[in-house]
Amino acid sequence: MGKYNLILSEYLSFIYNSQSAVQIPIYYSSNSELENRCIEFHSKCLENSKNGLSLKKLFTEYSDVIENATLLSILSYSYDKYNAVERKLVKYAKGKPLEADLTVNELDYENNKITSELFPTAEEYTDSLMDPAILTSLSSNLNAVMFWLEKHENDVAEKLKIYKRRLDLFTIVASTVNKYGVPRHNAKYRYDYEVMKDKPYYLVTWANSSIEMLMSVFSHEDYLIARELIVLSYSNRSTLAKLVSSPMSILVALVDINGTFITNEELELEFSNKYVRAIVPDQTFDELKQMIDNMRKAGLTDIPKMIQDWLVDCSIEKFPLMAKIYSWSFHVGFRKQKMLDAALDQLKTEYTEDVDDEMYREYTMLIRDEVVKMLEEPVKHDDHLLQDSELAGLLSMSSASNGESRQLKFGRKTIFSTKKNMHVMDDMANGRYTPGIIPPVNVDKPIPLGRRDVPGRRTRIIFILPYEYFIAQHAVVEKMLIYAKHTREYAEFYSQSNQLLSYGDVTRFLSNNAMVLYTDVSQWDSSQHNTQPFRKGIIMGLDMLANMTNDARVIQTLNLYKQTQINLMDSYVQIPDGNIIKKIQYGAVASGEKQTKAANSIANLALIKTVLSRISNKHSFVTKIIRVDGDDNYAVLQFNTEVTKQMVQDVSNDVRETYARMNAKVKALVSTVGIEIAKRYIAGGKIFFRAGINLLNNEKRGQSTQWDQAAVLYSNYIVNRLRGFETDREFILTKIMQMTSVAITGSLRLFPSERVLTTNSTFKVFDSEDFIIEYGTTDDEVYIQRAFMSLSSQKSGIADEIAASSTFKNYVSKLSEQLLSSKNNIVSRGIALTEKAKLNSYAPISLEKRRAQISALLTMLQKPVTFKSSKITINDILRDIKPFFTVSEAYLPIQYQKFMPTLPDNVQYIIQCIGSRTYQIEDDGSKSAISRLISKYSVYKPSIEELYKVISLHENEIQLYLISLGIPKIDADTYVGSKIYSQDKYRILESYVYNLMSINYGCYQLFDFNSPDLEKLIRIPFKGKIPAVTFILHLYAKLEVINYAIKNGSWISLFCNYPKSEMIKLWKKMWNITSLRSPYTNANFFQD
């Protein structure tokens, strides 16, 4: 058993280091004799510790248990009241505490003042501006660092340097925290007024960020960056991240391309040895110099010096240091402003009449035409999704807030809730449900607001609109997205592509006679100037579309959509300011509508087209590509002469002048070699991603448990690591120990072992080996997996009560009735389950389930009870396959150049040997014929799990399933009687397995699984025609080979001799695989 259990045991000795502390390991085994020894061992340990005897003798006596059984958990207890943090901290608090400069930030409350100065009384106090929003505490974080430091104080050589660097930085944190005392968190991991009143307001979030940074220090450069950010972020809570990361938008334009990858006709990345020189006008250097001066003004010294040293020769070899600075800047934590300031920010912009009306007209027309183009086909053909738009909206209604708390009755139970789904049910039950009337959002009914916080930018506000807006927009937006899916211009939505494809698109046309224009339009999206032309363009488009059909229901759908736009042109918002709620007329576009992403993309495409059409009057060029990706847009322009400094300068100034004529406050840049947008940046022909995910501070609180957050923490660590920001793995593991431990009583705690946290069960939190997803196949692993499956889903009394009420039942049956033309249990049960699952976002229900889960878990971690189950997991399948494979050594040469320099070496090696992929593997069954058939006639979207169930039914059951969803009998018959149906069986099984094996997550998403280089390492003689079996054998083999290579940096080849007799058995088993949802899979999904 791995490193985790070792560290766990050391950690417990470190934390509970008093005389009265005891650690009792609990073992289990799938072998019944050994299991009995485990039980004996455990009861004797308890006996001895009750009588205050040593456990040493038992460890010898039961060495068979310790050697052969598997560690399940460690029970630890200590009668010491645990103020150990303060005591240990003193040892490190030898430095000079930081003093906050209280004049750095423009807004008074962003200065790191003593809390009672910002909030004189407990009533005025709010933690919302500094809440770390994570279910772990500052004291735990301090403990984790001190544990690491104590464990490594005797390191030698290079490791000693790392120790010294971290110790030095921790001294700053420890001294500052110690000066005021460690803030004690409450049961909800929040910091109350009483605790904070005599301490600096931002102390906790600053200390968390600082710990995250110092535990990510390895090299001397890391140390310099971290030190500077830690010291300055103590005072500067507003602009630091922005200052440090601003230069990147120019740096990418300075590096020559010497060999790069481009997208070829087959949408694959292909190496091109082209050389493109960076042409940089003096003006650009002046702007860069200005940015660096601004950094110095803010007190930065080392970081600007690093940038200036790099500027001497602008080499791609040293560029990773620039990438590192850019990533690190985000780790200073979130900027959390007051709602009032966030809202006023958009309204501060001076509204001028002095704009180019002609350009606005063009912009509006382009939006109109694009909306028409997107919806023309579905409208002309009276698409059923547009006819049944209301039902489609209800089926995908989220359980987010509807903006106000209401009292709702479900049967005899009365509850208060803000959730949309509950409001809809309640309104239907009480005859208040009127989706045909879109409520106004004017001065009489202003919009409540949510918030979005992000490091390095100001807080943005989010509209929380009534659910009628969602229902009105859902179907139309879905149709827009379908159009965007097969339109290359929409980089974000383009069919199954990933960011590597977009990278190859840009580099493809870069040459000595081309330049690329890239613009960050986030300011424009939320500006007042955008709102009228934007909404009007959409309205005009909808008007034109309404004339293309005679179907009353389609016209109604378009009209309701139009009404949402009309209402939003006169929007007011409500902002709590102290005790009063202010109403403000808000004339800008904010997120919160269903259309936000799609409509912004349309508008940004229209914007760049407008600008290009203007500058084409002055310059002659061909537009090779136009792309829009979220808040950014970029275009590659090809000229008929070689690009010169003067040309770049002229185009740049013309572009800026053009934007200015629309009064668009955007950051537009022109370069010949690279771009920088929010999602990715390209420099020297290589692609980089910002590794800026915060680990110890979260944006907001949700209703996830500590286990969920531990999994998210690990997942964030992995993503950062792939992007070039590595945090010490021991530290991450220590955090996982802290966050997954379960308190039994005040002095008694249970710490699950590595086996519990890494086996793919409903409790999985992390992988024992980074980047490698293991599916345990040993007896003990399968045993524990079975044990956990027995307690996977927990009941909730409140949820059952709500689900039994007539309000709920009538709602579900109403949906079923509208959807189905005949009885269909699978779908009806599916809808009921989905609706019931949506109730989980109601806190009392999730709390109730959590409590049940914890108590079941506690029992299980002390003695696993396995159960005989007909359920088969992917582990069972792999366990059957494994014995038939034989391994031999192999050799694969490195044959591809690096194009993603930030990748860890072991992952990079694999891409260099087998190549990368530019597409997502389809894992939701949407490409199957049955899925397409259903979406042709029904608004219902079955999940991959449901398709997997359905496709394995008898043919007549499949027919009934289809007919009940409104598919004509003739189509259903044709489907079942055709070859397509048997292809579907295979295709859906394939999708389902890909889905189970997380093939589109982690680093697996980077590898080309169909690489001929990988294929040639696998030999599986072809026996009998069962494609599904050959598929699973190949996939298993590929994962084995890749996992081995990640771990060992060398290749193996696999030979499989699978007996024909076993094939049919395996094939039958493959139709019974259960999917396991765990905090780990949720965290992966959350990354999306």
Curated annotation (Swiss-Prot):
User: What are the EC numbers?
Assistant: 2.7.7.48
* Residue ranges annotated for the RdRp catalytic domain, each copy included: 501-687
SUPFAM superfamilies for this protein = DNA/RNA polymerases
Q: What class of enzyme is it?
A: transferase
Does the keyword Transmembrane helix belong to this entry? Answer: no
Q: Which InterPro entries match?
A: DNA/RNA_pol_sf, RNA-dir_pol_4-hel_dom, RNA-dir_pol_luteovirus, RNA-dir_pol_reovirus, Rotavirus_VP1_C
What are the protein's GO molecular function terms? nucleotide binding; RNA binding; RNA-directed RNA polymerase activity
What cofactor requirement does the entry state? Mg(2+)
Pfam families given in the database record: RdRP_4, Rotavirus_VP1
Q: Which UniProt keywords apply?
A: Magnesium, Nucleotide-binding, Nucleotidyltransferase, RNA-binding, RNA-directed RNA polymerase, Transferase, Viral RNA replication, Virion
Q: Which GO terms describe its biological process?
A: DNA-templated transcription; viral genome replication
> Where does this chain mainly localize?
virion
Catalysed reaction(s) here are: RNA(n) + a ribonucleoside 5'-triphosphate = RNA(n+1) + diphosphate
Q: Which GO terms describe its cellular component?
A: virion component
Q: Where in the cell is it found?
A: Virion
What binding partners and quaternary form does the record give? Answer: Interacts with VP3 (Potential). Interacts with VP2; this interaction activates VP1. Interacts with NSP5; this interaction is probably necessary for the formation of functional virus factories. Interacts with NSP2; this interaction is weak.
Tell me the protein family, please. Answer: Belongs to the reoviridae RNA-directed RNA polymerase family.
Give the function comment from the record. RNA-directed RNA polymerase that is involved in both transcription and genome replication. Together with VP3 capping enzyme, forms an enzyme complex positioned near the channels situated at each of the five-fold vertices of the core. Following infection, the outermost layer of the virus is lost, leaving a double-layered particle (DLP) made up of the core and VP6 shell. VP1 then catalyzes the transcription of fully conservative plus-strand genomic RNAs that are extruded through the DLP's channels into the cytoplasm where they function as mRNAs for translation of viral proteins.
Question: What name is this protein filed under?
Answer: RNA-directed RNA polymerase
